[in-house]
């Protein structure tokens, strides 16, 4: 039972108390002061339950990973492979389980994904890629008109995604689609291939310049560690948006193993060499 359900039950109980009859079922006379005491207790229960509901709403509100001061601080010379290790992981181990959790906000943006990565999840995913579920395109994927409506071509939605050529910091040329449906919890770690476990991320955000950067840096590190040790890894991922933008500026990954061998907080930038991204709607232009 989740916190919201529990809070609703408490609220219902409080309301029920205030509606109780004044005469005991056996016919005993009511005791002076009891009615007032019940009212006071009911009010207290009601206020506590209301606070719990508000706490739940605040915890899952659209502003959790969104503010007006988000900056990617991306410097290609410093972080050519699209990631930066910020320090040790910030993990609250008490909220983790082997059942992965995903969330989204009222702008339909993916907000968090977390879970306890274990050996079974990694081995069950080894050697294959899960197909994406229907309608798994994240916020910022579809082209929008001036009114914020998805652009249609006949009966089909028009995607922001296009095939491009990107000159990587290594000097090599990447030829392919600009965006990926970039997993928060990778499918190689048992993550689900659906809308609220992916963001609209550039190819470089997903795998860096040569397959070992971007999100792939920490994903591969965790996967290899779990395969070798069979230990668990606490893993949480949060994309960060500026205001009401639909595409995240960057993603923060926290990963901490049981034994502390892996203990990192990683910032993964959502940029593309030589291109300017409009994070508000997912469109992009060549510089």
Which residue ranges define each predicted feature?
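Mixed-charge, low-complexity intrinsically disordered regions
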Residues: 11-13, 23
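Domain-level detector of nuclease and nuclease-like folds
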Residues: 93-287
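Bacterial N-terminal signal peptides that target proteins for export
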Residues: 1-8
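N-terminal, intrinsically disordered, polar/charged segments of Gram-positive cell-envelope systems
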Residues: 24-95
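C-terminal motif of bacterial Sec signal peptides marking the signal peptidase cleavage site
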Residues: 16-19
């Amino acid at each position: 039972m989740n916190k919201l359900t529990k809070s609703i039950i408490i609220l219902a109980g409080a309301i029920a108390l205030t509606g109780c009859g004044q005469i005991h079922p056996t016919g005993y006379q009511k005791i002076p002061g009891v009615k007032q005491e019940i009212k006071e207790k009911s009010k207290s229960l009601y206020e506590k339950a209301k606070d719990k509901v508000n706490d739940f709403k605040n915890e899952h509100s659209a502003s959790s990973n969104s503010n007006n001061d988000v900056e990617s601080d991306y410097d290609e010379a410093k972080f050519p492979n699209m990631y930066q290790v910020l320090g040790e992981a910030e993990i609250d181990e008490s909220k983790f389980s082997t059942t992965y959790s995903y969330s989204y906000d009222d702008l339909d943006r993916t907000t968090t994904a977390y879970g306890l990565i274990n050996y079974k999840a990694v081995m069950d995913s080894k050697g294959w890629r899960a197909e994406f579920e229907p309608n798994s395109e994240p916020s910022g994927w579809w082209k929008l008109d001036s009114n914020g409506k998805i652009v249609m071509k006949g009966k089909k939605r028009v995607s922001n995604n296009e095939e491009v050529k990107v000159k990587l910091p290594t000097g090599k040329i990447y030829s392919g689609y600009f965006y990926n449906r970039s997993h928060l919890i990778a499918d190689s770690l048992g993550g689900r291939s659906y809308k609220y476990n992916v963001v609209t991320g550039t190819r470089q955000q997903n795998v860096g310049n040569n397959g070992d950067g971007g999100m792939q840096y920490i994903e591969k590190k965790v996967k290899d560690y779990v395969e070798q040790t069979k230990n668990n890894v606490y893993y949480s991922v949060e994309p960060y948006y500026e205001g009401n933008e639909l595409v995240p500026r960057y993603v923060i990954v926290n990963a901490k193993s049981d034994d502390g061998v892996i203990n990192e907080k990683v910032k993964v930038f959502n940029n593309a060499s030589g291109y300017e991204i409009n994070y508000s709607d997912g469109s992009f232009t060549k510089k």
